[in-house]
Amino acid sequence: METLQGLLLWLLLSMGGAQASREPLRPLCRPINATLAAEKEACPVCVTVNTTICAGYCPTMMRVLQAVLPPVPQVVCNYREVRFESIRLPGCPPGVDPMVSVPVALSCRCALCRRSTSDCGGPKDHPLTCDDPNLQASSSSKDPPPSPPSPSRLLEPAGTPFLPQ
């Protein structure tokens, strides 16, 4: 009887009854749709903009003997190529530049976190939504993403060149 049960178990397992998926468990680093908030202190309107950002999983390692060996540098999902699109904020008073630059991720990669261009974790200094929801206006022709993730933010002036690492 035990031989028969063992044979049946072997047969089920060998036919793919317990087969691992070839897909990664977490989505890897790639451009994804996201909604960002664009606002200026002097302008009375906050505009939400649909764009692409870099997000996803990057393989990392941690040393077992942390006290003896130096830490292993951790990589995060970073922009490889990015372009900036200018958005005009409506209702800005005269003398205030109504243009805001928004990043559009063209490609991404796993690399060391660059604080100059990425949100490396820790306290958030810029909200991902408008400060005052009553002032919110929408400015986008694309369909909104299914759910806004916690993105790396990359808001720089349009004239600032971006050089990939």
Curated annotation (Swiss-Prot):
Keyword Phosphoprotein in record: no
Recorded coiled-coil stretches: none
Alphabetized UniProt keyword annotations: Disulfide bond, Glycoprotein, Hormone, Secreted, Signal
SUPFAM superfamilies per UniProt: Cystine-knot cytokines
GO cellular component terms, A-Z: cytoplasm; extracellular space
Position of the signal peptide: 1-20
Disulfide feature: 29-77, 43-92, 46-130, 54-108, 58-110, 113-120
Primary location class: secreted
Compartment(s): Secreted
GO biological process: G protein-coupled receptor signaling pathway
Further details from the record: There are at least five copies of CG-related genes and at least two of these are expressed in the baboon placenta.
Family in the record: Belongs to the glycoprotein hormones subunit beta family.
UniProt function note: Stimulates the ovaries to synthesize the steroids that are essential for the maintenance of pregnancy.
The protein, known as: Choriogonadotropin subunit beta
Biological source species: Papio anubis (Olive baboon)
Highest classification ranks of the organism: Eukaryota, Metazoa, Chordata, Craniata, Vertebrata
Gene that this sequence comes from: CGB
